Amino acid sequence: HIDGGLKNLPSEKQVVYSRFINPTKYVIRKHSEIRMKTFNKLNDKEDILIIGDSHSEDLVNAVFEANLNSKYEFSSYYISVNCGVLFVKNKIDREDSRIGCKKMSFYNEDLKKLINSADQVWIISSWRKQDLYYMEESLLNISNLNQNFKIFGTKSFGSISKSWYKRTNQDKWSTLVIKDSDIILFKELE
């Protein structure tokens, strides 16, 4: 995220693109522009509030690049992944004390008003295992303000890796292969 994806390009393209864009500024710019933006209730657009960590910055960029802003109006709110993107008042064990998580909390009266006024609330995070403990309470608290919300997270393809595909015959690719560590995790999530 920090380099705006440039590191994934061949080195010659990195040099060219870096002369035209500042990747770090690109990633956060649009999210910052619409942060805590009040919705214009006089237009015909559906109002969507996007709340989250750096993944919300990526989602904001994606919706604008897809020109969804022609149909929807967007506002955003940033919460550090180290604070936990959770609508729970007391989660000290989940917060990084060096960041000042109370300032980025869901417990912000202006944010509550924005959640209430949105047609949809999209919450996105790089969820951590300790977030599971708070998830039920968090979802209940959000639904008390706005029942039309969607939760987004990171992807997980389990324990199958690129090397597994290289060494495994194609006819076995549809066979379920799960490591013991994945089975334990699935049982913990139940």
Placement of each model-derived feature along the sequence:
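Extracellular/periplasmic envelope-modification machinery, especially enzymes
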Residues: 1-190
